[in-house]
């Protein structure tokens, strides 16, 4: 999987945003996709969301959470938003870096290739922090393997939609988010695995600000083929010695 997957040779317009409401960001994606189809640039949005659950098209009724509350006083209800992306239900919130590439794919379309490139970019960022991660066959996203009595743990989720050869939605990398938010759901419909974060695995705080520049570079390089997709058969926390 080398060479660019994009139809354009122009650079990607990377927009580093702050905290953006999910519905606002979703409309932003649709507007950017319309603009891209009309000849505008490829764009990568990097941001955080206030706490929200998003349900992909394959979410079953029993997988939706009951009332969940957040906020300092625990009295702010967390919304559940139905989306048009693939996959099932997940959580977004503070401490999680969300990326939305709005990219016109080259022909012939290869959505699996596109997803593998997103995974590769997040595997690269994790490795540069000292954490080896990998793919799991049959499951999208980036994972820590089972070991020491712990199940496989997802550190980054991916859910995309491609319409008019243009991508929407994207990925979510858990940096220093509240992992308890995932306990109200079966994340992505996978009941035999866990969820983790960079901070939890590395034993130190790894905030969104620390990784957002590296994620932007890695995603752009992966989409353009400068970061090739590789096999990652094993994964562990790299030794500091």
Curated annotation (Swiss-Prot):
It is found in: Cytoplasm. InterPro entries: aa-tRNA-synth_II/BPL/LPL, BPL_LPL_catalytic, Octanoyltransferase, Octanoyltransferase_CS. Keywords: Acyltransferase, Cytoplasm, Transferase. Gene3D superfamilies: Bira Bifunctional Protein, Domain 2. It comes from the Bacteria. GO terms for cellular component: cytoplasm. It catalyses: octanoyl-[ACP] + L-lysyl-[protein] = N(6)-octanoyl-L-lysyl-[protein] + holo-[ACP] + H(+). It is an enzyme of class 2 (transferase). Residues 38-227 form the BPL/LPL catalytic domain. The keyword Protein biosynthesis does not apply. The record marks 154 as: Lowers pKa of active site Cys. Substrate binds at residues 85-92, 157-159, 170-172. In the reaction, the free carboxyl group of octanoic acid is attached via an amide linkage to the epsilon-amino group of a specific lysine residue of lipoyl domains of lipoate-dependent enzymes. Catalyzes the transfer of endogenously produced octanoic acid from octanoyl-acyl-carrier-protein onto the lipoyl domains of lipoate-dependent enzymes. Lipoyl-ACP can also act as a substrate although octanoyl-ACP is likely to be the physiological substrate. Pfam families: LplA-B_cat (PF21948). PANTHER family: LIPOYLTRANSFERASE 2, MITOCHONDRIAL-RELATED, OCTANOYLTRANSFERASE. One of its GO terms (biological process) is protein modification process. Belongs to the LipB family. This is Octanoyltransferase. The lineage of its organism: Bacteria, Bacillati, Actinomycetota, Actinomycetes, Mycobacteriales. GO terms for molecular function: lipoyl(octanoyl) transferase activity. The active site is at residue 188.
